[in-house]
Each structure stands twice: as C-alpha cells, then as structure tokens.
C-alpha cells in the first residue's frame, strides 16, 4: 500500500472509507488505486462492515442530488421533499440528509416502519398499504423516487403530480429509463 506523492492528511495505517468513481471500478479487489477526493477517514464509532455499506447509500443520494440534478446543499433549506420508499437503506440515509439540510420530509413506507422513518426525521409518513401519497401530498419542491415504475405502477406520474408548478421543482429517480425499456421490450442484440 502506498500514498501518492502529493497526498496529504493520510498515513499508510489510517482506516479509511470511500467509493471509486464509475469510471474506476475495482472495489471488490483487495487493493485499488483511488483519487484522494474519493476517500476519507473512517469514523471511529463504526466498524468496517458499517463503513462498507454507508458510503454506498450516502453516495447514491449525494450523486443523485448534487451531480445529476444540480441541486446544492445551501439551496435546500426550507424545501418540501417527498421520498418514495423511505425505509430502505438509501431512503433512511436520504431522510437524515435532507433533514440535516433543513428540509421538510414526507415519505412512504409500510406500517411496521413508520416509527423508524419518524425517528430519522420524517415529518409526514404515508403507509403505502393504506393511502395513495399522490392524493395526500401537494406542492412539493422535490420528489425523490427510489422505486420507479418497475416497482410501483405509474410512480413517475404520481410523483410528478405532487410537485409544485414551479420551474424549480425537481423529480429525481434512481431508475434509468433504459431499465423500463428493457423490461417492456427486452434486450436488443
């Protein structure tokens, strides 16, 4: 294991965590060469198993918000955010991140997970077995759809229905349109 000649703030024996960029795979390897901005010191209060899983959910959300949607943390304070599927790994992290950035959070989950998402900071929770979120929620600034149409029928339309009519509203999804095309039409070879 080596440090690059211009790397500062790290020592060879430091415990670190991070994630390579999409262009640089190899994280299933025993060793990988990684840019210094893709790694940081592992917090002392978590173990290596937790350190291996947290960056994935954190960077999934951060990448969707910052890199792909163009939102900036300072612009989110006071925004109304809907998270479709708040009880999963990415959803649980997203609730905490948006809450920490000063947002009002609404989310969906099953009845058994309501207390969990509330404890993470959700202001409003809709049990998806009891209510349709698109009938309850209105004028949201951001709809973060973690399920997409391949899991929840017409999810895109339902999420867009709850958005305010502002040009600053955002629909963010983790589902690439290609997934739905492959599901409906198959793989073209």
Give, region by region, the residue ranges found by the protein language model.
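Terminal helix/beta-alpha structural elements that buttress the NAD(P)+-binding lobe
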Residues: 2-3, 8-189
């Amino acid at each position: 294991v080596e440090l690059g000649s211009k790397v500062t703030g790290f020592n060879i024996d430091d415990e670190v965590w991070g994630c390579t960029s999409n262009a640089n795979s190899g994280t299933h390897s025993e060793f990988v060469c990684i840019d210094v901005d893709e790694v940081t010191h592992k917090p002392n209060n978590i173990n290596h198993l937790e350190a291996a899983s947290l960056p994935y959910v954190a960077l999934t959300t951060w990448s969707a918000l910052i890199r792909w949607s163009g939102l900036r943390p300072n612009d989110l304070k006071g925004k109304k955010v809907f998270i479709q599927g708040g009880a999963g790994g990415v959803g649980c992290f997203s609730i905490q991140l948006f809450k920490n950035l000063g947002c009002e959070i609404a989310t969906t989950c099953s009845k058994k997970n309501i207390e969990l998402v509330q404890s993470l900071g959700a202001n409003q929770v809709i049990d998806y077995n009891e209510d349709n979120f698109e009938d309850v929620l209105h004028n949201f600034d951001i709809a973060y759809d973690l399920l997409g149409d391949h899991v929840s029928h017409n999810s895109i339309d339902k999420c867009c229905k709850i958005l305010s009519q502002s040009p600053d509203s955002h629909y963010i999804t983790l589902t690439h349109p290609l997934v739905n095309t492959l599901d409906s039409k198959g793989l073209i070879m």
